[in-house]
Amino acid sequence: MIAGMRRLTDRLFGRGEAASTIPPFDGPLKPNQALETAPVLLTLDTAEDLATDGSHVYAAAGQSVLRLDHDQPTEIHRFGGMVTALCCLPGGSLAVAVDGREVRILGGTHDGKHWTSVANRPLNAVNALAPTADGRGLLLTDGSREHPCERWCHDLMSGGRSGRAAQLDLHADSAREIANGLKYAFGICPAGAAIWISESWAHRVITCGDGGPLLEYLPVYPSRITPAAEGGFWLTAFTARTQLVEFVLQETAYRRRMMREIEPRFWIAPKLSASETFLEPMQGAHIKTMGILKPWAPPRSYGLVIRLTTDGLAAYSLHSRADGTHHGVVAAVECNRHLYVLAKGCGKILCLPVAALEQEFMT
């Protein structure tokens, strides 16, 4: 009742969830070119996720799981569907999500175990996996009940709030929901006794249990979270928010007509990569002059990795700005003191030395 009244007053006064204002990129989120100038390790057009066991980096690419040996990928598993999420488990096993609808365990003592539903509800858009803190279970986020992983933009434009997080017990073969009713859950990670979950359409990271915000009012749509070797975490964001998109999200009749009559690639909506077509909805001299996109223009796509402390505070960030190409960052893992970043928008895996990042941004 109280929440309903709050939403009503927010819409009346244009505040809270109904506000079209965007927090600035400031402080630890101050823009830079760290991602845009990062060395490219590999180009994988179908890459979807990254994982590491501390010694090797693995990539989900199309229907395959690849091990990255320097700049040479080696296929180690292949499936009959697209791999939408991936993580390494203790004991040398892997967990993969296939087509967002099935979670499988590969190798180790739990080899062959799989799940297709949680709490009597089929899995639909599994987009992130992580081991529990004790290593006996598996955490996952199921982004949406209505839309598969590849239709994430449809979920945003439809006002989706059917995401959930779940925990799978590898020993008891059981599964339970730990959070539901989320505005597109996309990222999960244990943090001590707590569990952190990215809630993309709410622009925040929450803690499981009380569902309280850990990091909120972000100017981006957060995605996967992974641990950093020296403590803390890496949080990725697959695109940035804009006032125009926030306005469109409030205009229900316009948005529904746009979705009904216009091709999705021309929607006024976030994207994973920059567009070069003359039909794109955002043009003009304040955005592009003589074919050159200005770096301060409202971004249709963006690339961002945020370094979080153990308390969930932003320490610094790595950017590929509006005029860059390393956009649509959906995964970042640290292995052997290097940060591997997947920019899905351009299909590239970047590699940055962590020591150099710490020296540049922490001193």
Where are these regions (language model features)?
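Sequence-structural signature of mature extracellular/luminal beta-sheet repeat domains
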Residues: 1-363
